[in-house]
Amino acid sequence: MEDEGYHRFLSRCASPLLKELSPASEGLDFGCGPAPLLARILMENGHRVELFDRYYFPEYGAIKKDYDFIVATEVVEHLAAPGDELTRLWRQLRPGGFMALMTKLVISPERFASWHYIRDPTHISFFSAETLRWLAQELGAELQFVDSDVIFLKKSGVYPE
């Protein structure tokens, strides 16, 4: 049986993304985990979604193409080199496409030491609004904070020369 709480959690990313996507868009659920519910939500709404997860769907060849959207929910905090990985994924995003991220953001340096999110030993990379603004600038992306932990990066609609 599906966890309704998890469905609501992922809908905070899926619902606004679905409003942005063209019909029958092609996407990648990067780091989808063992039960790719977000991919299923997107597919039920007419989109094609490929899966990649280092442990559960390790077919890395699947992410050697371009996509209209890439989602990474509760993934970037687990990456040892998130800048490298996000840049690589960004190159696979078509012009006008969206990269949708979900991760808890650092509120302030003062609160970091007591933040519950750092207690998970698999969380090794942390982001703040400032970090994401920097990343967006580096990528040439339009940044949108959709919710407290839902971030969209939109690629410009033209290929660079």
Regions found by a protein language model. Name each.
Residues 1-69, 86-87, 119-120, 130, ...:
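Conserved N-terminal segment of class I S-adenosyl-L-methionine
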Residues 47, 78, 123:
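Histidine-centered active-site/metal-ligand motif
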Residues 56, 77, 106:
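Active-site micro-motifs of SAM-dependent methyltransferase domains
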Residues 69-82:
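A short SAM/SAH-binding and catalytic strip from SAM-dependent methyltransferases
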Residues 79-92, 103:
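A short, conserved alpha-helix within the catalytic core of class I
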Residues 96-105:
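Conserved beta-strand signature within the Rossmann-like core of class I S-adenosyl-L-methionine
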Residues 104-125, 130-131, 135-137:
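Short, glycine-/aromatic-enriched active-site segment of Class I SAM-dependent methyltransferases
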Residues 140-144:
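Short secondary-structure junctions
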